Amino acid sequence: LAVSLAVAHAAAISRGVLLYNHIADIAQPQEKCLPMPMLNVLNGGKHADGSTDIQESMIIPIGATSFAQAIQMSAEIFTELKYTLKGKKYATTVGDEGGFAPHIKRGNAEAFGLLLEAIQNAGYAPGQDVSLAVDVAASELFKDNRYIFESEHKKYDSDTLTEWYKKMITTYPIISIEDGLAEDDWEGWQHLHASLPSTQLVGDDLLVTNTERLQYAIENNAANAILIKPNQIGTLTETIRAIQLAKHNGWNTIVSH
């Protein structure tokens, strides 16, 4: 990857253009749009011992009209989340990725409730101004053909976990689920996609920015969005190919940030 990026920098310099313009010339995007950040404000799973089973609980400022406003809204909510946690006697220590990592007492759903409270306290409307997203990192929870939610002392198979997701998205404004099932649970992913057709279902561990795995997922209706990480596939060219393949098939692309 280092060599690939160095070549891209050198090519941009030799052409006398900025790097992002050089990459755009290679990728030939069909449309231009401002990025919508997804901010990891509650850490769990492998990123925070003793917190939620879900690895990342995120906020998405969907009502923002500019990137600057999106960051401002998110910062306000993050500050309110700290006050919300303190008000409930939870610690405000942080996990590996900078989000709060409280020892939630009543399971994963309580974390979503805390986020809604923080959003409202910041003066925003959940589901209108700000929505939620999760990175379950389900491969880390998968043992002996079951998904183990230790904080709730529960075990799920792919079907019952899908039902739990359905319940959560009807109760909370969750619009995106990343790695909701294990990376090789292809049948489970197909069922998840069929069950939640309006939810963004993101493959990270499932797809690893690999066009072969992405093509298989597309052909088998196993997800509808891909997380893009150049370090997973190893070159800028292969990264661009993955983005192009996803967009050509109507998938959303999320550049890891």
Give the residues covered by each predicted segment:
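Mobile "lid/hinge" segments at catalytic clefts and subdomain interfaces of large enzymes
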Residues: Q28, K32-G95
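Hydrophobic alpha-helical hairpins/lids featuring a short glycine-rich hinge
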Residues: L1-N43, H47
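Short glycine/serine/threonine/alanine-rich loop segments
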Residues: V17, Y90, W251
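Active-site-proximal beta-alpha loop/turn segments in soluble metabolic enzymes
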Residues: E56-F67, A91-N108, A137-E152
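Anion (oxyanion) recognition and catalysis
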Residues: I13-G16, K86, K247
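Catalytic core of soluble alpha/beta enzymes
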Residues: A109-H257
